[in-house]
């Protein structure tokens, strides 16, 4: 890892300016949400684990949940000078990592995460301009704050820009 890379852990988020790159690994059923203000060149990345917090009575880490992490990321970006109407989103992850014959056993958390992220971004009026979701492989997301490009590295499938 070099000085221009910022690692985002699971149930974590951060905001950066050029020339920084925001990187998150281990996107299985989790979703990486990259938000970018191309005018101010401010980028933010969140790594969420679960679709929504409403089923939990005690939320120890709000960054685990799509419904709480996205507003937190927006607030952090706006404090850096980002303008919500300029934001565009790119998302990755949401895989079905376990091959159970009965999909309801795990309630397809990857698909539920993906739907929840899209719903929350829609509520904030943030368009998703690119995505790499679904499937059954883990991903790494590398987000450049220079130009908003997101590189996806998928296990056994190489590298793809979204």
UniProtKB/Swiss-Prot annotation:
Catalytic reaction list: L-glutaminyl-[protein] + H2O = L-glutamyl-[protein] + NH4(+)
Gene3D superfamilies reported for this sequence: 3.30.1330.200
One annotated GO biological process: chemotaxis
Highest taxon of the lineage: Bacteria
GO MF, any single term: protein-glutamine glutaminase activity
InterPro entries the UniProt entry points to: CheD-like_sf (IPR038592), Chemorcpt_Glu_NH3ase_CheD (IPR005659), Cytotoxic_necrot_fac-like_cat (IPR011324)
This enzyme's EC code(s): 3.5.1.44
Group of enzyme by EC: hydrolase
Keywords of the record: Chemotaxis, Hydrolase
Homology family: Belongs to the CheD family.
The protein's role, per its UniProt record: Probably deamidates glutamine residues to glutamate on methyl-accepting chemotaxis receptors (MCPs), playing an important role in chemotaxis.
NCBIfam families membership: PRK13490.1 (NF010015)
PANTHER family assigned: CHEMORECEPTOR GLUTAMINE DEAMIDASE CHED-RELATED (PTHR35147:SF1)
Protein name: Probable chemoreceptor glutamine deamidase CheD
Gene responsible for this protein: cheD
